[in-house]
Amino acid sequence: MAAPWASLRLVAPMWNGRIRGIHRLGAAVAPEGNQKKKRTILQFLTNYFYDVEALRDYLLQREMYKVHEKNRSYTWLEKQHGPYGAGAFFILKQGGAVKFRDKEWIRPDKYGHFSQEFWNFCEVPVEAVDAGDCDINYEGLDNLLRLKELQSLSLQRCCHVDDWCLSRLYPLADSLQELSLAGCPRISERGLACLHHLQNLRRLDISDLPAVSNPGLTQILVEEMLPNCEVVGVDWAEGLKSGPEEQPRDTASPVPA
């Protein structure tokens, strides 16, 4: 009967050794599992942020495409209905309003619908355009520059209107008398300097232009540039109360401070 007990005594160390070996193996495997888990999380975060960036780029490109489509040229429509009809249609599609000479204002409703009656006025000059909050950009101005009798133009809060757009307004110099640029975030002093062609302007609104670094001084310069124009929207002393060392610096200027 001693033999079985002896066999057990011989087997026990071997079994215990295997258990210890398994534990040591588990301890060696554990870090690799943690590393794999970390790699999985890192890969997830990489893919996640890549997807977010790709989505952002896609939405940006989609928005740019929509703006481009809204500002396409209506030359084909001009051939059928003339420049007044094509220009009016462009503004109304953008959500703006137009006024033909001796007619009432035509505006779209809250759903973007507007009366087709304006097609009856295609031979009547457009004398006023309210394009406030519209998506007009540099290319879209082609549809307005053909309105040679345009007297009043409002571009308030047009986020795509910039200095380059103002440089294109000179074809309206003979007729344009009122211009509103209030709230346009991309218009600076450089763009306002391009308005020297518009010597028939009688009223110019340049209020709330965040890209203008010194509104008070800018208004003074614009008034000298357009002596027959009433420039409104800026306190002449704004930006002139602080000393020269406190003046905000134009970071886009190539001239060092």
Curated annotation (Swiss-Prot):
Localization in the cell: Mitochondrion
InterPro entries with a match to the protein in the record: LRR_dom_sf
Gene Ontology CC terms: mitochondrion; SCF ubiquitin ligase complex
Domain of life: Eukaryota
Residue positions where Phosphoserine is found in the record: 253
GO biological process: mitochondrial respiratory chain complex I assembly; SCF-dependent proteasomal ubiquitin-dependent protein catabolic process
Gene3D superfamilies on file: Ribonuclease Inhibitor (3.80.10.10)
Keywords: Mitochondrion, Phosphoprotein
Entry annotated with the keyword Mitochondrion: yes
UniProt keyword Acetylation present: no
Subunit organization: Interacts with incompletely assembled mitochondrial NADH:ubiquinone oxidoreductase complex (complex I).
Known role: Required for the assembly of the mitochondrial NADH:ubiquinone oxidoreductase complex (complex I). Involved in the assembly of the distal region of complex I.
Family listed: Belongs to the ATP synthase subunit s family.
Protein name: Distal membrane-arm assembly complex protein 2
Organism: Homo sapiens
